[in-house]
Amino acid sequence: MSDAHGIARDQLRAFIERIERLEEEKKTIADDIKDVYGEAKSMGFDAKILRKVISIRKQDADERMEQEAILDTYLQALGMIPAAETEDAA
Protein backbone atom coordinates (compact mmCIF):
# COMPACT_ATOMS: atom_id res chain seq x y z
CA MET A 1 0.00 0.00 0.00
CA SER A 2 2.87 2.37 0.70
CA ASP A 3 4.10 1.88 -2.88
CA ALA A 4 0.75 3.14 -4.18
CA HIS A 5 1.03 6.22 -1.99
CA GLY A 6 4.61 6.72 -3.14
CA ILE A 7 3.59 6.49 -6.80
CA ALA A 8 0.71 8.91 -6.30
CA ARG A 9 3.01 11.27 -4.42
CA ASP A 10 5.58 11.10 -7.23
CA GLN A 11 2.93 11.73 -9.86
CA LEU A 12 1.56 14.65 -7.89
CA ARG A 13 5.04 16.11 -7.46
CA ALA A 14 5.67 15.72 -11.21
CA PHE A 15 2.43 17.53 -12.06
CA ILE A 16 3.20 20.33 -9.64
CA GLU A 17 6.73 20.76 -11.00
CA ARG A 18 5.48 20.81 -14.60
CA ILE A 19 2.89 23.43 -13.73
CA GLU A 20 5.50 25.52 -11.95
CA ARG A 21 7.82 25.38 -14.97
CA LEU A 22 4.98 26.37 -17.28
CA GLU A 23 4.03 29.25 -14.98
CA GLU A 24 7.64 30.48 -15.13
CA GLU A 25 7.60 30.25 -18.93
CA LYS A 26 4.27 32.08 -19.02
CA LYS A 27 5.72 34.90 -16.92
CA THR A 28 8.76 35.13 -19.18
CA ILE A 29 6.55 35.31 -22.25
CA ALA A 30 4.32 37.92 -20.62
CA ASP A 31 7.42 40.00 -19.84
CA ASP A 32 8.57 39.65 -23.46
CA ILE A 33 5.17 40.79 -24.73
CA LYS A 34 5.27 43.76 -22.37
CA ASP A 35 8.69 44.66 -23.74
CA VAL A 36 7.39 44.53 -27.33
CA TYR A 37 4.48 46.82 -26.42
CA GLY A 38 6.98 49.19 -24.81
CA GLU A 39 9.14 49.12 -27.91
CA ALA A 40 6.14 49.81 -30.13
CA LYS A 41 5.09 52.67 -27.85
CA SER A 42 8.56 54.18 -28.06
CA MET A 43 8.18 54.13 -31.84
CA GLY A 44 4.95 56.12 -31.57
CA PHE A 45 2.35 53.34 -31.66
CA ASP A 46 -0.56 53.29 -29.22
CA ALA A 47 -0.30 50.14 -27.09
CA LYS A 48 -4.02 50.15 -26.28
CA ILE A 49 -4.89 50.16 -29.97
CA LEU A 50 -2.31 47.45 -30.68
CA ARG A 51 -4.00 45.26 -28.05
CA LYS A 52 -7.37 45.92 -29.69
CA VAL A 53 -5.99 45.00 -33.13
CA ILE A 54 -4.57 41.76 -31.73
CA SER A 55 -7.90 41.00 -30.10
CA ILE A 56 -9.72 41.59 -33.38
CA ARG A 57 -7.26 39.43 -35.32
CA LYS A 58 -7.96 36.53 -32.96
CA GLN A 59 -11.66 36.61 -33.79
CA ASP A 60 -13.35 34.65 -36.51
CA ALA A 61 -14.37 36.96 -39.39
CA ASP A 62 -18.07 36.15 -38.99
CA GLU A 63 -17.93 36.72 -35.24
CA ARG A 64 -16.17 40.03 -35.77
CA MET A 65 -18.74 41.19 -38.33
CA GLU A 66 -21.59 40.22 -36.00
CA GLN A 67 -20.05 42.14 -33.10
CA GLU A 68 -19.46 45.18 -35.29
CA ALA A 69 -23.08 45.10 -36.47
CA ILE A 70 -24.35 44.90 -32.90
CA LEU A 71 -22.02 47.72 -31.86
CA ASP A 72 -23.28 49.88 -34.73
CA THR A 73 -26.87 49.16 -33.71
CA TYR A 74 -26.18 50.21 -30.13
CA LEU A 75 -24.30 53.35 -31.19
CA GLN A 76 -27.13 54.31 -33.54
CA ALA A 77 -29.68 53.76 -30.79
CA LEU A 78 -27.70 56.12 -28.57
CA GLY A 79 -27.40 58.70 -31.34
CA MET A 80 -23.64 58.40 -31.40
CA ILE A 81 -23.56 57.63 -35.13
CA PRO A 82 -26.13 58.43 -37.80
CA ALA A 83 -28.63 55.71 -38.62
CA ALA A 84 -28.00 53.90 -41.87
CA GLU A 85 -30.23 55.12 -44.67
CA THR A 86 -32.77 52.60 -45.88
CA GLU A 87 -33.88 52.02 -49.44
CA ASP A 88 -37.38 53.27 -48.51
CA ALA A 89 -36.02 56.75 -47.85
CA ALA A 90 -34.79 57.08 -51.44
Swiss-Prot record:
InterPro entries listed in its UniProt record: GapR-like, GapR-like_DNA-bd
Organism of derivation: Sinorhizobium medicae (strain WSM419)
Lineage: Bacteria, Pseudomonadati, Pseudomonadota, Alphaproteobacteria, Hyphomicrobiales
GO molecular function, one term: DNA binding
UniProt-listed HAMAP family: UPF0335
NCBIfam families in alphabetical order: PRK13694.1
Similarity field: Belongs to the UPF0335 family.
Annotated signal peptide: none
Protein name: UPF0335 protein Smed_2680
Pfam families hit by this protein: GapR_DNA-bd
